[in-house]
């Protein structure tokens, strides 16, 4: 098997420093591999695109943003995406039960099976896991601008911005049905979670050909501790503050410009057309029989 490992050296928590040593010592000798470090934004996508038809697997080493950058060029190809999670949230890896441990994630490359998953586009641009608007997108932008990465930086920003952010009313259309919804957070989910074990859409599956639209009302101070607990326990769908719809095509007409895809903030002054692309990306997942 021929493999390319693509490392984002500045992603997430800095665990990448030991990855070359671990790969050298753990990867099967039968695997012909090379390791490439990205040098600029978009470099990982370029490497993946140029090699997708001439290698057996391309492995992204980094966080959700890195996984998206490297995975997007593989959509529609026969080359699977491997993931070694080394970011702050690692949402897609967690959803796919890929180990967060670097050692165990490398072992997965040695002993894996291939799963084909859905992907999503927003105005033609792909993402893999979740898209967020409202407070969700606001925090993603704050986190992107923040000097320190990691889970606790994210939590600090949530508490800092909680009192500042006012819920908004969104114009939404799902498979031709239109409605308005006031919400604190709007999430379009292909997988179940953002990352760090924060599960926004517990009932989402990544290969069902459906998008899940989750709208969350802003909790008051008394409701907040239970809501946070529900995020991490995985039963947010039982909260009366969460509403859920599903469909294949979602349009959001007034989104106040800011949104994020897989944690990466973006802006647009146009309506957002979001479409599911069923079974369009191959990924490596644990081989439970191995």
Label for each model-derived stretch:
Residues 1-57, 177, 290:
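ATP/NTP phosphate-donor binding region
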Residues 59, 82:
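Short aromatic-hydrophobic micro-motifs that form the base-stacking/packing surface
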Residues 60-65:
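N-terminal glycine-rich "phosphate-gripper" loop used for MgATP/nucleotide binding
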Residues 66-77:
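Short Gly/Thr/Asp-enriched flexible loops that form oxyanion-binding sites at enzyme active sites
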Residues 132, 187-200, 265:
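Glycine-rich phosphate/pyrophosphate-binding beta-alpha loops
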Residues 166-168, 182-184, 207-212, 246-248:
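A generic structural signal for short beta-strands and their flanking turns/coil linkers
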């Amino acid at each position: 098997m021929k493999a390319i490992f693509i490392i984002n050296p500045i992603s997430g928590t800095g665990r990448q420093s030991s990855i070359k040593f671990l790969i050298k010592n753990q990867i099967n000798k039968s695997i012909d591999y090379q390791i490439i470090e990205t040098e600029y934004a978009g470099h990982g996508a370029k490497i993946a695109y140029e090699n997708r038809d001439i290698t057996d697997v391309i492995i992204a080493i980094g966080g959700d943003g890195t996984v998206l950058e490297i995975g997007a060029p593989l959509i529609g190809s026969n080359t699977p995406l491997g993931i070694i999670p080394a970011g702050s949230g690692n949402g897609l890896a967690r959803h796919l039960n890929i180990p967060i441990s670097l050692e165990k994630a490398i072992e997965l490359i040695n002993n894996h099976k291939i799963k084909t998953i859905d992907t999503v586009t927003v105005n033609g641009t792909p993402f893999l896991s979740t898209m967020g608007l409202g407070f969700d997108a606001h925090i993603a932008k704050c986190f992107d601008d923040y000097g320190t990465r990691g889970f606790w930086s994210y939590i600090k920003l949530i508490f800092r911005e909680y009192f500042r952010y006012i819920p908004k009313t969104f114009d939404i259309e799902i498979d031709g049905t239109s409605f308005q919804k006031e919400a604190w957070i709007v999430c379009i989910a292909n997988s179940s979670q953002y990352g760090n074990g924060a599960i926004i859409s517990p009932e989402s599956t990544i290969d069902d050909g459906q998008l899940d639209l989750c709208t969350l009302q802003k909790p008051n101070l008394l409701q907040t501790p239970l809501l946070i607990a529900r995020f991490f326990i995985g039963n947010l769908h039982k909260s009366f503050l969460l509403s859920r719809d599903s469909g294949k095509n979602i349009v959001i007409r007034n989104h106040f410009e800011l949104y994020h895809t897989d944690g990466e903030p973006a802006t647009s002054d146009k309506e957002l057309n979001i479409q599911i692309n069923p079974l369009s990306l191959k990924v490596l997942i644990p081989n439970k029989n191995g």
